[in-house]
Structure formats: C-alpha cells, structure tokens
Amino acid sequence: MTRALAFALFVSLFITTNSYAQRFAASGHLASSQWSEFDGTDIGGGGRFTFMPTPTIGVEADLTWYPGEFPPDGIPFTGNRFEGLFGVTAGPRLAGFRPFAKAGGGFMKVSESSQPIVCVAIFPPPLSCVMAGGPTMAAFEFGGGVELLPTGHALLRLDVTDRVLKYPGPSLGANFETNDDGFWGHALRFTIGAGWRF
C-alpha cells in the first residue's frame, strides 16, 4: 500500500510539474553577422525551436542560412554558409517580456567558392584560400537578448551575441600574421525575429 501511494504521489508530481513547466516556441529570424577576419556584414535567415523545461530556462536549436557570396566587397571565397547553434537561455519572465542571457555551441559550414579564385602559392596559404575549400568550423556564442510577449502566444525576439569561430590553419591572415594552427575569432551576431509559443 505504501509503495502504491508513493508511486501515485510521484506520478502526480511529475505530471503536475510537466504540465506547468513544458513550454515550446518556434520562430523565424533575420540574422546579421560579422566575421573577425573579413570585412562586410553577412545577412541570412533561419529558424529557432525552443523548449522551456522551467519558466526561467530555455533549451534551443538555432539554424541559419546565409545565401549570398562572402565577403560582399572583394573576391568572395564562399557561395553560402549554414550555421547551427544549440544552447541554453536563462532569464525571468516579467510582465510582458523576458530578458535573458544565453550561451551555445555548434558549427558553421562554409560552402566552397562558387567560382575559381586565384591563390598565391605560398605557405601558409592566405586564409581566404583556405576558406574557399569549404571548411566546417566550430562555433560558439555568448550574449543575451529579450523576448517581447505582446499577447497570447505571439513573441518577438532580439538577440545580440559574440559569435566565436574556430578558423582553420595553417593560414596567413589579412595583416600577414601567421597562424600555424587553427585560431579563434570573435565578432558580433545580431538576430531579430518573431514566433509562436505553444
């Protein structure tokens, strides 16, 4: 009898907690990203799926596609890029909005150059020539943002983060610095979007 009562209590607590805590959101966003080693702004679009196990913690997957050649000025080394970032947000839900801090990790897949580029036959090769080969780079982001919750299930969201990319090596940088191994570069990433909570 005691086991049955304990089991029933456990199940009721689990169901009550989950019915209160489980929240999902799906949204689309416009992304504007900088690169630490190249000039120009990378513009893309994507989607985000969020699971909120508690009212203050969110677990999310953020996928973004950057369709244009990059860099926009000069000789492009890539035709498009695909980015996947997976992480957590933490912040209180207040009256009509939720400020949050966030951290995550993932990847940035750079496509090969859509047209041939001329590379000087030196070692190490220029970074743009290494990037033209289409590497997949480790990516991290740290920052924060705010969700606006105007009415019902709708949401508007703004994120500002420091995106950290692991550039491949060996390579020669724009200022002729030599990188024998891969190296990390930091740059601003900004997204704005809208979605639906359910």
Where do the language-model regions lie?
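Bacterial N-terminal signal peptides that target proteins for export
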Residues: M1-F7
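Surface-exposed strand-loop-strand hairpins of Gram-negative outer-membrane beta-barrel proteins
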Residues: S32-G47, P135
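Sec/Tat signal peptide C-region and signal peptidase I cleavage site
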Residues: I15-A21
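Gram-negative (and chloroplast) outer-membrane scaffold detector with strong preference
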Residues: R48-F140, L148-R157, G185-F198
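Cleavable N-terminal signal peptides
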Residues: A8-L9, S19
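A beta-strand edge to alpha-helix "cap/lid" segment located at domain peripheries
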Residues: I117, L165-K166, D181
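Transmembrane beta-strand segments of Gram-negative outer membrane beta-barrel proteins
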Residues: A21-Q34, A101, G185-A187
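Sequence/structural signature of outer-membrane beta-barrel proteins
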Residues: A31-E37, Y66-D73, M108-E112, V164-L172
